[in-house]
């Protein structure tokens, strides 16, 4: 079936063209914004056509703005031909990651909730073209988003030209799942009238001026979501420790939950399926497989996010029972899903993943050994600075014990000790609220560090207190010595340690 039946604005029927023709609107040096937040709802046909132009010898270096990470047809295809001069605001693909760390692509790592407003303010440059995936186009030109919303509403508003990919692999049952609202910019912004997870304040479509539309492109390529690893024993242990803490401190009724992207976050949500909790509500960015488990178990009343982000199997599961799941789900622009005002008002329990933590509660979420970018801060900072309970989870050790995730000092700080409330590892929980740094360290060492690293951390902490003292004892000549040792020997353990 063609896309004509999905285009209700008859003037736009004349704009139907091929991906190759549409791609000609993309020129060297342009700022391009696309739909997509994780590998869901991103354009596929036009980006592939752009990459083909470069493969044939044309020079294209572009600034690429999205909601977050996107699929292989965009990030990876463009990175492979080195077409991305600058990337905003998050990424997960192997090739784009290599380009960033090699210096071929400049990467602006920004809190996800702030990007749309900064674009409207003009800080990120003038957007030349927006490429947006649609389920269908309404009579007024409004676009029904598919499996993510991200920054698309603002991109459509700000771009000089718009290319719409109507994706027939996305079911029409997605119509009505989104709630699109663009807030006024400060200082004219009013309070956002959301006091519960399932409240709606906008429209089901993204406004778009039909006069901006230069091409409407058919596409039938499905979302290529990423597999989730099987839930391992470390992740199960973290989930058990956290749920036990919640049961003790919150009782039977929890405030809305926020859960980050990835295997650990999915494992924690999966752990709630086996708990006694009912009537759960989730206000988050991404909706992964465990959310469907909670809905099926009758434990999740409502979930708000900006994107679906399930495994390939989870996505097919969603499509099979789409009417059941969509009744519980609302997708919003990321400046709403990650909004500081709403996170503070709802008193969220925010659960996100750390690369490493230090004995004082600082968290590194982005850079291995302080240097190599992994994915980006994403939305974790939006929630860590505003949630009612801020939780960071990480295994106590990695690489068969060669790396401790609890270190004397993190090599890069994304979330400071001032906002981190709870650290959870497979070893236990450290509740840091109301504590001096010198009170936090013993809790983190004893409750969260791997057993083989506890004596080493105690040795560092005790010597730091004795040698330099102060409010935040730190041995400057040893703070990163564990990382140096790993680079030199392949383990953070000193020679002769078990």
Model-derived features: where do they sit?
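Conserved alpha/beta enzyme-core scaffold
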Residues: 1-498
């Amino acid at each position: 079936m063609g896309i004509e039946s999905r285009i209700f604005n008859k003037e736009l029927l004349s704009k139907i063209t091929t991906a190759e023709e549409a791609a000609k609107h993309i020129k060297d040096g342009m700022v391009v914004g696309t739909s997509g937040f994780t590998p869901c709802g991103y354009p596929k046909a036009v980006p592939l056509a752009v990459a083909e132009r470069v493969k044939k010898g044309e020079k294209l270096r572009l600034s690429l703005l999205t909601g977050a990470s996107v699929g292989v047809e965009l990030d990876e295809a463009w990175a492979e031909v080195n077409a991305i001069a600058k990337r905003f605001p998050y990424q997960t693909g192997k090739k784009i990651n290599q380009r960033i760390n090699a210096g071929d692509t400049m990467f602006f790592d920004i809190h996800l909730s702030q990007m749309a407003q900064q674009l409207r303010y003009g800080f990120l440059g003038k957007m030349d073209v927006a490429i947006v995936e649609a389920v269908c186009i309404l009579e007024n030109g409004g676009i029904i988003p598919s499996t993510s919303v991200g920054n698309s509403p603002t991109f459509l508003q700000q771009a000089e030209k718009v290319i719409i990919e109507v994706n027939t692999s996305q079911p029409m049952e997605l119509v009505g799942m989104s709630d699109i609202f663009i807030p006024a910019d400060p200082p004219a912004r009013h309070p956002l009238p959301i006091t519960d997870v399932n409240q709606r304040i906008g429209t089901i479509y993204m406004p778009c001026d039909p006069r901006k539309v230069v091409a409407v492109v058919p596409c039938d390529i499905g979302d290529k979501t990423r597999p989730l690893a099987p839930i391992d024993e470390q992740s199960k242990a973290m989930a058990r420790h956290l749920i036990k803490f919640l049961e003790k401190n919150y009782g039977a009724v929890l405030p809305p939950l926020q859960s980050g992207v990835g295997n650990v976050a999915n494992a924690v949500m999966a752990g709630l399926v086996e708990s006694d909790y009912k009537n759960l509500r989730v206000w988050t960015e991404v909706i992964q497989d465990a959310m469907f488990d909670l809905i099926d178990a009758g434990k999740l009343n409502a979930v708000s996010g900006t994107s679906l982000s399930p495994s390939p199997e989870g996505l097919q599961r969603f499509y099979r029972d789409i009417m059941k799941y969509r009744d519980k789900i609302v997708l919003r622009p990321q400046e709403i899903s990650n909004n500081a005002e709403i996170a503070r008002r709802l008193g969220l329990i925010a659960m996100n993943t750390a690369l490493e933590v230090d004995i004082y509660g600082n968290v590194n979420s982005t850079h291995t050994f302080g240097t190599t970018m992994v994915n980006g801060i994403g939305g974790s900072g939006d929630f860590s600075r505003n949630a009612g309970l801020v939780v960071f989870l990480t295994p106590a050790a990695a690489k068969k014990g060669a790396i401790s995730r609890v270190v004397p000092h993190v090599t890069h700080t994304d979330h400071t000790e001032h906002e981190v409330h709870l650290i959870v590892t497979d070893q236990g929980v450290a509740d840091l609220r109301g504590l001096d740094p010198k009170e936090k360290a013993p809790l983190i060492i004893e409750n969260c560090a791997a057993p083989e690293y506890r004596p080493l951390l105690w040795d560092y902490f005790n010597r730091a207190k004795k040698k330099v003292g102060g409010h935040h004892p730190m041995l400057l000549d040893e703070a990163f010595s564990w990382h140096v040792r790993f680079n030199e020997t392949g383990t953070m353990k000193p020679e002769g340690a078990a």
